[in-house]
Amino acid sequence: MTEKNNSSSIEEKYQERTANLRKTKRISPFWLLPFIALCIGAILFFQIVKERGTSITITFTNGSGIVADKTQIRYQGLQIGIVKEVHFTDNLQKVEVVANINPEASSILRENTKFWLVQPNVSLAGISGLDSLVSGNYITLQPGDGDREDEFIAEEQGPIAQVSAGDLLIHLISDDLGSISIGASVYFKKLPVGKIYDYRINKNNKVEIDVVIDKAYAKFVKKDSRFWNISGINANISPSGLNLNVESLNAVVQGAVSFDSPADSPKADENSHFTLYTNLKAAKRGIEIKVTIPASSALIAGQTEVYSQDNAIGILAKLSAVENNDEILEGSLLIDPNQASLFKANSKIVLRNKKIDLGNLAEPKKFFRGEYFDVIAGDGETKHQFNVIKENELLLNAPNTLVLTLTAPENYGVSEGQNVFYNNMIIGQIVSQTIDVNGVQFKAAIASEYRNLIHENTQFVAATNFDISVGLDGLRFESATPEKWLQGGVRVLTKQGLGKAKDSYPLYQNISNAEHGITGNILTPTITLHTQTLPSIDKGSLVLYRQFEVGKILSIKPKTNNFDVDIYIYPAYQHLLTDKSRFWVESAAKIDVSPKGISIQATPLARSLKGAISFDNGGSGNNRTLYANESYAKSIGFVITLITDDATNLSKGMNLRYLGLDVGQIDSIQLDAKAKRITAKALINPNYMNIIAKEGANFTIISPQISAGGIDNLDSLLQPYIDIEIGNGNTKTQFNLAQTAPQRNKFSNGTPFILETRDAMNLSEGSPILYRGVEVGTVKKFELNSLGDRVLVHIAIMPKYSHLVRQNTEFWIASGYDFSLGWKGAVFNTGSVQQLLKGGISFSTPAEKEIQPQAQPNKRFLLQINRPEEVQTWGSGALSK
């Protein structure tokens, strides 16, 4: 029962307490997605921040060529960043650039890191930044030391050279920078081995220059190395001459430094300091040679150079006077150690004087060398002390030297120490010079190997003399080759090598004097000529004999009524001058105008511009008159007089022609006031005087006749002349000069006839006379009869055709065209163009059973206007002469 009660109570209990079931709340898987996204975002953020790198600020003076999100930052050719922003500073004076640097490169962002802009740059010093032409401007840097930094100030220009591993950095100390610039090359044995890196003023107020030597050449820099400046062009003018030193173009523009190093010196350490000398001479590197020198004011210590075989090997380092001896000096030479083998017991040191030499223009170093030492190598033991000898002593002391004396009225610019040349090759030297009241004497030494070039007829000419003359023919100079103009000396002229060498020779001023045998410098006239008017000659004009130069004009002196012309005939040709010599002025050109064309025979240009005189020996008596031309000179005494009423076409110098040959010319034209006429004097060639000067000769002026029909006398278009028809009478010297228009020569002897007509129509003088279309004559002139009702046409028929004119011959006007209209139709005939323009006359003889006799000269015929209708049936038979 008890158990029953307990179970019921429990049951009641549980019935009274109803169980409430509650479910546990859990996070939904959906909320994992935002969490995952957040994690991924955080990772990406940190990745972006990491890849973004370090942000830095660079300040530039200007932003030229810098573009945001485009301009790169490079280091050793690789991109390590990019520009993100570009903006002005607060004062608008500079530009700030914000850039991102890649994380792997952030370690180089230090306090002394340098940034600069790279862009293409072209200058005389070179071309830089070529890679920026393709990719555009970029920013580069040079790593530095110090603390980390993110703000920088850009450099105006980056360093040209950068110190890399193995390169040698050294420092040069100098009083001034000179013409050296950053980036200038450093040379060793003419080979570029480094660059100028930077320069500054150090604490001692000296210029300190940083030099980077490439690692491949660092071993050549020794502790005892010496550096000197080879920048630009170094020139020094002194009594010893002009010392000119020109390096490469790069050294001239940008500057350069060179150095040398002793082979046995230890290698230089990093950051070693060296003195930078102004030049090689100041560096004083070399072997010392003691010398005793002949006294000379042109020697300067530190400047006078030492040469061997035209190569500079040293310099005069010291120079001092010798007590109580003014003739010598003591000094020492610094010689290139590589040339020590030149100085042996039998070597010689010669003091030479290299004067200005235009032949060395291509080598500026030789142009103004001045006085210098020349080392002639010899054999024997090494020697370090020498007595210097002069250049002339070297040749005089040589065995078998030929010594000559040259005499001249003055020195002609030749002086002691100058060379003697043969075919531009040095064969000797002027060793001494003396002056007395008679002139100048030179002692010349000819080297033994060339003494065979000197003979009895050898001539010596001053090569120093630079003979300049200015005249109508321009600037004329006479001298030796260009390199001898200022170098000076004596030239040797050898002809055929006749005879042995003499002890003494004259020294000629120039080649012309040598050729003509002129030994003096003052010329005296050989002969004096007289002329009424001054022709086209001047002082210095040539005198010719058969076109060969034999002299020249010394002077022209005006007198009251004439001019005196002083002439000098060269001594070699004075035998050509005789009592029968006659002189005339040489024409500049001979012009011949003919139907064949214009022939011009010109003299050489110098004669044309300056004039010349010619002479021959065909005269008579002692005639010293200078004639205007050759014709005048040869025609003196052979004169005729021509009289005319009009001088329109007459001129002085007009030629007289016979059968196309010039036989004389008009000498003068004068007006005869009393007789009211013109009188002309004509000079006749003596060879034709007996033919021309005869009674019955006709003289006619030939000038061009221009008409519609053409141009007659075309040969006189440029130069009218006088035509001569010779006579058969006695000798006569006065003639009338005809002014009428001449007929052509083929009709001059034609048979004359007279044609009568009412009107001349289109006829003119010179119109052709035609027979069957062939020209057989011409119209000579027109005139009216006494009543004035008819025109008389005078014609001339060529002699060989005069038999065609018969007693019954008919003449008609052939105007060039004929038109007729009839039952049979229209007939139109034309002639030549000349007939159309100039007109013409045709003739024919009617056909009859008996041929009429030949017409007599001057017979009159009727000139018909129209062509006879029956003319086509005429002339069917031959007419006998």
Curated annotation (Swiss-Prot):
Tell me if Disulfide bond is a UniProt keyword of this record.
no
Cite the InterPro entries for this sequence. Answer: Mce/MlaD (IPR003399), PqiA-PqiB_transport (IPR051800)
User: Which residue spans adopt a coiled-coil conformation according to this UniProt entry?
Assistant: none
**Disulfide bridge positions per record:** none
- Subcellular location field: Cell inner membrane
Q: How does the protein's chain sit in the membrane according to the entry?
A: Single-pass membrane protein
Gene Ontology CC terms, in alphabetical order: plasma membrane
- Entry's Gene Ontology BP terms: membrane organization
Q: Does the keyword DNA damage apply?
A: no
TM segment ranges:
30-49
Key words, A-Z: Cell inner membrane, Cell membrane, Membrane, Transmembrane, Transmembrane helix
Would you identify the family this protein belongs to, as annotated?
A: Belongs to the PqiB family.
UniProt name for this protein = Probable intermembrane transport protein HI_1672
Q: What species was this sequence derived from?
A: Haemophilus influenzae (strain ATCC 51907 / DSM 11121 / KW20 / Rd)
Q: What is the lineage of its organism?
A: Bacteria, Pseudomonadati, Pseudomonadota, Gammaproteobacteria, Pasteurellales
